[in-house]
Amino acid sequence: MERKKAVVLLSGGLDSSTVLAYAISLGYEVHAISFDYGQRHSREMNSSEELAKYYGVDRKIVHVDLRSIGKSALTDDIEVPSRDLESIPEEIPVTYVPARNTIFLSIAAAYAESIGSTDIFIGANAIDYSGYPDCRPEYFNAMEKALTLGTEIGLRKGMHINVPLQYLTKADIIRMGLKLGVPYEKTWSCYKGGEKACGECDSCLLRLKGFMEAGSEDPLEYEKYPTFYKDYIEKRKK
């Protein structure tokens, strides 16, 4: 019996790698898609390549020049804020890329339709989502309807956006990934483009907080470890 196909958005980050492993565990024939959109943290593209090879899945790279649109610290010469965990804002942060998920999901839907798939998986999260409007449940519900109405295969079978991490905390996601055997040492979350993760941007802080709350240690090396994580590691050693 032919396996059902699914397209998984694979950035190379912690969330998308967990979703990749999850979709594989469900028995899907997974086709990964990664986007080179001019992000300053291009290290994640290397991570997505490593993860695709690790899991033995096909990976399509799509180039989308979002730098030409601008207005994001992830693509422009806008400083990525360094702060502590308590100061992560609830409003839309400067790392928001205008309509990124809408663009990515539209392209993923086109790819899915081309291979006869009606399932798209994305690693978005509505709890530790750092204020992004295109990570909310109501957004994905609306986008799923649009892709169903806007594709030929959607009109026949329906298009499904699967967001399995939607209501999980970062700690829950990490626990899930560890059970699935996700090689988190191959992932990359930092918003900055250094050799090591910075340990100060929102993404690094949420990741380290997640590992701490999951009762595990992050296998990545950081330029700077926040005080809460250093205290946690010291307690683990005792």
From Swiss-Prot:
Cofactor note: Binds 1 zinc ion per subunit.
Keyword RNA-binding assigned: no
Gene3D superfamilies in UniProt: HUPs
Top-level class of the enzyme under EC nomenclature: ligase
UniProt superkingdom: Archaea
Binding-site list for ATP: L10, S11, G12, G13, L14, D15, S16, S17, T18, V19, L20
GO MF terms held by the record: ATP binding; ligase activity, forming carbon-nitrogen bonds; zinc ion binding
Pathway: Purine metabolism; 7-cyano-7-deazaguanine biosynthesis
Cofactor(s) needed for function: Zn(2+)
Residues engaged in binding Zn(2+): C190, C198, C201, C204
Reactions accelerated catalytically: 7-carboxy-7-deazaguanine + NH4(+) + ATP = 7-cyano-7-deazaguanine + ADP + phosphate + H2O + H(+)
Keywords per UniProt: ATP-binding, Ligase, Metal-binding, Nucleotide-binding, Zinc
Ranges that cross the membrane: none
EC numbers: 6.3.4.20
Function: Catalyzes the ATP-dependent conversion of 7-carboxy-7-deazaguanine (CDG) to 7-cyano-7-deazaguanine (preQ(0)).
Family: Belongs to the QueC family.
HAMAP family associated with the record: QueC (MF_01633)
Protein name as catalogued: 7-cyano-7-deazaguanine synthase
Organism annotation: Thermoplasma acidophilum (strain ATCC 25905 / DSM 1728 / JCM 9062 / NBRC 15155 / AMRC-C165)
Gene that this polypeptide is encoded by: queC
